[in-house]
Amino acid sequence: MSKLITIERHILEQQKNFPEATGELTDLLSDVAFAAKLVRREVVRAGLVDILGFAGSTNVQGEEVKKLDLFANDKIINAIGQHGRFAIMGSEENEEIITPPNNENGSYALLFDPLDGSSNIDVNVSVGTIFSIYKIKNSDPRKADISDCLQKGSEQVAAGYVIYGSSVVMVYTTGNGVHGFTYDPTIGEFLLSHENIVTPKHGKYYSINEGSYAQFNDTTKKYLDYIKEEDSATGRPYSTRYIGSLVADFHRNLLTGGVFVYPPTTNHPNGKLRLMYEGNPLAYICEQAGGRATDGRRRILDIDPSELHQRTPLYIGSEDDVRVAEEFEQGIR
């Protein structure tokens, strides 16, 4: 019988690979796992309680906020911020940075999207939480500010996501491989189910919202025409798989191989996805699993951010597939 390894135990085991570790990051990841359990509890009950529908407000992105978005955001801030282990936090739902109480001993910054894909929750499609952790630059946690959040993705010390679907899965990396855990509701624990995830170098799926085809530039249209052509030597045509929930589309492609593309459009020439809350954490995970992530021209993790809610195009997934998409975007093909 295989051993049952909880996420907390696995994090502690991973800590042994770093003799200089203080255990603080281990506690932070455990806090994130706990917050995910709280969000999961409400997501699975969403149709039974008054938590569906819109809250009657818009977020900093100009999007209508759903009640469950606000619930998830508040739960994560309260569950994680109360321990004082984070000096500063940033949420996709909050315009400004968040300073947790009792943060004088915090050494890290947390950036998160509390409920990615929440527009799908009413129709029982998978949604998720995405998070990113950085070491703050400021020597005094009480003086931590937005500059501690605006770091390149390559500076991340941990990143992960939780997908709430037919099962609840948490995936994380601390720069030493990618590991996945499935939630067992009978014991209330995340158990190791996907150790050392490695994404295929070449896949057969592509994920893109083709409903925006008229807004795509010519290079994106040429790319789509290319991957639909018959060519057994290159494994074409690809099959499309698009849920409309980034974390769900990314998770599937991470395991099975493929590419997720959210290119520039006429409505969003700088891209639509958020660099700090979606691009960076997923790029870190993808690279740790052997994949590739760019904005079509630059490595996502090398982008120097200038805004907390900065947007970016995103090409992410299997290395070979992302390179092909890049070549079209750059006009090489």
Curated annotation (Swiss-Prot):
Protein EC: 3.1.3.11
Pfam families according to UniProt: FBPase, FBPase_C
Binding, substrate: 116-119, 209, 242, 272
GO cellular component: cytosol
Gene3D superfamilies with a match to the protein in the record: 3.40.190.80, Fructose-1,6-Bisphosphatase, subunit A, domain 1
Subcellular location: Cytoplasm
Alphabetized UniProt keyword annotations: Calvin cycle, Carbohydrate metabolism, Cytoplasm, Hydrolase, Magnesium, Metal-binding
HAMAP family the UniProt entry points to: FBPase_class1 (MF_01855)
Record-linked PANTHER family: FRUCTOSE-1,6-BISPHOSPHATASE-RELATED, SEDOHEPTULOSE-1,7-BISPHOSPHATASE, CHLOROPLASTIC
Assembly mode: Homotetramer.
Name assigned to this protein: Fructose-1,6-bisphosphatase class 1
Species, as recorded: Chlorobium phaeovibrioides (strain DSM 265 / 1930) (Prosthecochloris vibrioformis (strain DSM 265))
Taxonomic lineage of the native organism: Bacteria, Pseudomonadati, Chlorobiota, Chlorobiia, Chlorobiales
